[in-house]
């Protein structure tokens, strides 16, 4: 053997910093402690002088009598343990301070290579025979002596002689001296169906044999797939996974020169029964992975590129590699788990775009009754919300403490848990819910067919606002055109950027309270989707601000509340209040049912698609003229509702495109900026002389205040 192979082998064994981590030998259970139930058995003392969990792993790894360790995430303490969760008289317990790391060889139920390192607790052979204890010489005599190093414990299957067939044991049957235990290799223990998004096996090597980097580490390769942000992707330890919709499972490698590689995993046979994705053709549910309709343009009306073509855009999403994703012709699809169906476009300057013009399938349950007016006189017995959630009794104080009770509202007949409208909510009867995450929701009711909804009131003579809707003069508007089509660089301190788990901008929003953002329902796959890893960015004009920009505030999203049916609105509650300053300000909410007079000049702001009119870097602001719904409906053939409003560009084409959705239509009224509309997907964005449609915020102001009041 030459000196170079020896050097490479030596550096691998020593675990050179920046390559292999000692944590690679461990599986982690977050927020978990391992207790031993026998008081006479005590774990090792806490060691408080460790830098991180990697140092703990470096201490535990070489010790034969260390099989696991606790890592205290707050004090950075380390406690070495001589047992695992499979040891007798132990139990797992949830913990708010500790993570539990256990050596893979002791907790894996499959084997790597020929299983020489297997230290599991399988104790029966492939033929079902009990194993003989290694310390016994009867009924079958043998030469092996149990030690800590060879791991010949109890009567567990082991492979002390490196048998190619894997772990084995002597049996308790005098007629069968020894037999294989038939433990599957980790490669064979779990198979891949479709593109392997649901693969949760324990293979931690790539197809070239390189060891995988742990998902919870950022070396040797930095990446966005932090396990704490992608809770639904199974990013366990350093096992092969597919969190980004690649053609098959992969991992980052411990080789600094090779960032990532695919893993060699067997495909499932026809007998495997994968989770069936519900398919739809006229609408889409969730993120639209099951959409199989024929929409073939983007929200902006740009034709889609065929999936089997590589012009004008080269890509990896070919029908052959994604056979189960139905990548037919140029239809909108979602092969990679994006926020909604999308496609590559035929426009060379626009690589890909979403197809938000496809409507979402409603998840409301079928109405069980009807009501007149606002439903204040409804006295029926419906007791479920529009989502099918059971109503809380009006007399109960859990899970929500009610503000309206039979005592406080004797005329509202707040009986049992029946839907009522004690506060005159304009969106109909409602109730407190039995879901701890949802204080209240509207009920499974519809307006009666013979009931005419009230028309929007005339605008009041005076609108007064005091502490919101103020800003410093915008930046020089003559510099350039930007991403709102026909727009200019500007300051819109209430406009926020919604960021997904990879930190990418996907929608806009408006700061209406220090802890609340108003945005569009179309930006989210579900009203109950996991929000871990989603953030709101405020205080910057740049789509990709520099690291450490002093005015940037990044706040995690804690909660989502979907608006009344048909509103297309969502309120996001932040984990903490933002700090208001010149770069971060509240925008005023309009009075209820306020109608912006035609001819009013308003502005939209965002970081969305520009159709080639500008660069990617700065917040865009564009002016638009408000027009009446009557004029708007001439072009839109009567489809614009009173809960919507319209604008037409002052300089065609001017308007909102993809990436701007959820952002504000702000109008300057009585020396204040007022949030009059929310940008929603239009059939074609920024089309010359074609009215753009927005959700009219004033129709839903009572709901906004109610949600913020109830928290």
Curated annotation (Swiss-Prot):
Ranges of residues in domain PAN: 21-105
Residue stretches making up the Kringle domain: 110-186, 191-268, 283-361, 370-448
Subcellular localization, as worded in the UniProt entry: Secreted
PTM description: Cleaved after Arg-483, probably by HPN/Hepsin, to yield the active form consisting of two disulfide-linked chains.
Record-linked Gene3D superfamilies: Hepatocyte Growth Factor, Plasminogen Kringle 4, Trypsin-like serine proteases
Keyword annotations of the record: Disulfide bond, Glycoprotein, Kringle, Repeat, Secreted, Serine protease homolog, Signal
One Gene Ontology CC term in the entry: extracellular region
Superkingdom per UniProt: Eukaryota
Disulphide-bonded residues: 56-78, 60-66, 110-186, 131-169, 157-181, 191-268, 194-324, 212-251, 240-263, 283-361, 304-343, 332-355, 370-448, 391-431, 419-443, 468-588, 507-523, 602-667, 632-646, 657-685
InterPro entries: HGF/MST1, Kringle, Kringle-like, Kringle_CS, Kringle_sf, MSP_HGFL, Pan_app, Peptidase_S1_PA
PROSITE patterns hit by this protein: KRINGLE_1, KRINGLE_2, PAN, TRYPSIN_DOM
Record bears the keyword Ligase: no
Signal peptide annotation: 1-18
Keyword Repeat: yes
Subunit structure: Dimer of an alpha chain and a beta chain linked by a disulfide bond. Interacts (via beta chain) with MST1R (via SEMA domain).
Family per record: Belongs to the peptidase S1 family. Plasminogen subfamily.
Matching PANTHER family: KRINGLE DOMAIN-CONTAINING PROTEIN, PLASMINOGEN-RELATED
Protein name: Hepatocyte growth factor-like protein
Organism listed in the record: Homo sapiens
Lineage start: Eukaryota, Metazoa, Chordata, Craniata, Vertebrata
Name of the encoding gene: MST1
